[in-house]
Amino acid sequence: YDTLIFAAGILGSYTYMLCGGIFCNAQTGNIVLLGIALGTRSWTSALYYVIPISAYALGAFISELIPDDVKHRFHIRWETILVAVEIVFGALPASTPVQVFQVSINFIASMQYNTFRNSEGVPMATTFATNHVRQLGIGLAKELHRRHGDTSHRRVIKRHFSMVLFFLAGTILGAVACIFLGRRAVWVAVLPYAIVFAAFLHADLTSEKEWLERDPAGH
C-alpha cells in the first residue's frame, strides 16, 4: 500500500504540473475549481473540469461492475489486473495528448481508490492523504487518553503515518521528474506499479491462489 500511494503521489504532481492544474487523486479540488468557474461564468473552464470529474466517476463505476468477470476469465484477482492496467496507462508515449492523460489518470486513480480499501483490517486510501492525516489526529488523541497498557492504536498510527510519508515522497519525486523529464515524467510511476504487480501476480499464483473469490479490497 505504501508503494501504491507513492505512485499516486507521482501522478498527482504530474497532472497538476503538466496537465493543466487538475487533481487526479481526488475530486474535491476539481469540484471547487468547477464551482469557481461556474460562479465567474467561465463556461469553457467549467467544461474543462467536468471532464476529469466524469472520468473519476466512470472509474468507480467500472471497478464495481467488472471484477468478477475479469478474475474468472484470467484466474487472477482484479487487484492484480488493475495494477497491470495502471502500468499500461503510465507507459503511454510522451506525445499522447494532455487530454488523454487527464482522462486516463483520473480514471485509473478512481479504480485504485475504490479497489484497495483496507490493509490488514485497517481502512486505507491509496490515492490521497486526507484520511490518513485525519486518522493520525484520531490516533494521537487515543494515545493521549489511552488506558494503561493499551497500545493497540499505535499500529494504526504507524500505518497512516507511513502512508502520508510515502505520498509526500511520491509528490516530491513527481515534481522533480516533471522539471527534468517533462511529459516523460509519468513513466517514473511505472516502476512502483511494476513492483506491486510482480508481488501481486506471484501471490495469486502461489500463496494466495485460494483467495480468488474474495471481494476486491487489496492483498
Positions of predicted regions on the chain:
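Alpha-helical transmembrane segments of multi-pass membrane proteins
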Residues: 1-219
